[in-house]
Amino acid sequence: MDNKRYGHFDDQHREYVITDPKTPWPWINYLGNEDFFSLISNTAGGYSFYKDAKFRRITRYRYNNVPMDNGGRYFYINDNGCVWNPGWKPCKTPLDFYECRHGMSYTRITGCKNGVEASVLFFVPLKTLAEVQKLTLKNTTGEVKKLKLFSFEEWCLWNAATDMENFQRNFSTGEVEIEGSTIYHKTEYRERRNHYAFYHVNTEIQGYDTDRETFIGLYNEFANPDAVMEGKPRNSHAHGWSPIASHYIEVELKPGEEKDFIFLLGYVENEQDKKFVAPKVINKEKAYAIIEKLNTTEKVDKAFAELCQYWDALLNIYNVRTGNDKLDRMVNIWNQYQCMVTFNFSRSASFFESGVGRGMGFRDSNQDLVGFVHQIPPRARQRIIDIASTQFPDGGCYHQYQPLTKRGNNDIGGGFNDDPCWLIFGTVAYIKETGDFSILDEMVPFDNQPGSEVTLFEHLKISMDHVIKNLGPHMLPLIGRADWNDCLNLNCFSWDPNESFQTTENVSEGTKAESLMIAGLFVVTGKDYVALCNKIEELKNGKIENFNSSTLKSFNFSTEAARMQQAVDAMIDAVKKHGWDGEWYLRAYDFYGRKIGSNECDEAKIFIESQGWCTMAEIGAEDGMVAKSLDSCKKYLECEHGMVLNNPAFSKYIYEYGEISSYPEGYKENAGIFCHNNPWVIIGECLAGRGNDAWSHYAKILPSYVEEKYQTLHKVEPYVNCQMVAGKDAFRPGEGKNSWLTGTAAWMWYTVSEFILGIKPDYDGIRIDPCLPETASDYTVSRKFREAEYEITIHPNGAQKGIKQIVLDGKAIDGAIIPYSAGKHVVEVTM
């Protein structure tokens, strides 16, 4: 397949530049950093929402539509009968020039046609509940241009799920108000809702439309709205049906003249007793304040500069210079940016996730923390509290929670037995980054129930105990509904296509099927828990000022560390005895006690998840198990585009295994390349000192390398990781799916920053422990850590692993940890 190119990286401006609107799939970006968010494609498709893409959807979007990516924030330009859009869609009029620049929380789309240049800057200003759309029109001809400009947004009726189904109600609820150049969407505001949205432009308008059928025409499309094609607004007022917001502006441009138009899509919540200023007239005071804040080009430019400065600061916390542009751009820009997005959205809203079916995942959000905690630690801290608040008293937890309410999702429930361990993983990462042990003293409820509060540390303790209390016949962890692999449903037994694999239970009640993946995870997080307990005991004597809880002050952390170490040792013994297949670790035992992921199996003889976690746990390393497992990954799982999840693929549905065997060969969990778990094996390679293999695996799924070789085949955005790449058994190996919202982002960051480049936050400072390919050159990492700034230069000298000497501020130090102290420091590391 020819590798047609649709764009390129612009590292200086931290942008990806798309030069052809007809990308193989919509290539999107995310706007907003907190509360107000938007998804925007390279042709301005997408939608906006407040906090929760399900319950506070502001604008409408139709997934899997024909044509693809139809609907968004559109500007129609009628130039003497020639109608076009700056982003090509929806009219798809051929443009003389097109460019989309996706940057850090902003997108700029530029189109030119017949001597008119239209450029739109889209962004959400910091701490503002509005999306700015700054449209600049420029006349590049020697003649006067008279243009008819139409804006367009289609309102969603708030709940994105019922918006797509409850039409017997929806067609009768839509309400709007029009005041000057602002169109207000107030559907259902009269009753239980206290929120509305608005669409404003900072100039006088010559007309408007708020009824979709009137504006477009019942049998027309976004590509040919009646009002636009005829150049005449209808001044329609929506009463039910489908409300929209469209401004009509007559624009005259002299030769060489350009004009700015500031459009604002905003969201407002009012206090219950301040909803109206007169009967049926909404209180617009907060909307006026947003408009006043952003009603001129100068104000918008200032807000945009502040956003850019915000990202400058975030991306200067960790910066590497290796001389390898492909590596540097991913580490310094796009990987960290994607980590922010996954932290904000978990797996809820992308062009593959509709924002309706999933909220914030317990497992997902804890993993996302390791890619984000260095950027904004206070937000990471609050996220940990929110996650722990959805835990149950027995240590189990809701699998997901809604971002708007922060309450557990009853539709999914719990019973995914890996979930509790991830709370230790996320919390330890936070404390190592910040040194803030006081988080362990926070009083956190169970299931968000008032009066049930215990310290966060007690939540960690019962998380570990949940695994210990749920062991199977081989003393390995029970899998429950599933472990990390939501599609390995060993207690489901479903023949009914109308039921969910994840939520269907059979009579076994999950008391037999066991997971080697959870076993490895338990050992890794158990070691972290033991080290945390020992560190607390070391610091307890007056050195942790904020430990106010009598429970924690009187708790014997040394005894707890010893207790948990025994449990970890027992798990290691169980894995060695019952989890080793000769060349690799087993994946699981099914309900009947049969091996899964064994050479004895007809298909799916080896799985990546247990190889990753058991090698990360270094189980049996002294007996050669880790090395054999890693060799088996390379021999049986690796292919041109990464490592597949299992091999060979399932060729038929096996009801004892569940959803995993329902996929065609090479896709998703059935031998697809799940990019999320490739880093687990890479970390195992790093811990084993195998830098050449670690780098080889890493580069295969690094977007900048994929972009260079497989831009057309890969299909999805070339600047971020995707969840899944079609495996070697697929019809089209190398094709990507499920981009953006994937744990791959955090794991790629964690892997490269801490294990390959080797800069690891620790309780007492920064641990230096790189694992590099033999070809690696000298490199420098600038790392802000708490109140310190470190300039760390690594001299590999051809070594893959091992430190000969560390020189801190001109003096050699013992050990591999740079002791923390505030201020600026220069570090030289010789391998």
Where are the model-predicted features located?
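Active-site lining segments that contact anionic ligands and/or coordinate catalytic metals
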Residues: 104-106, 244-248, 258, 609-611, ...
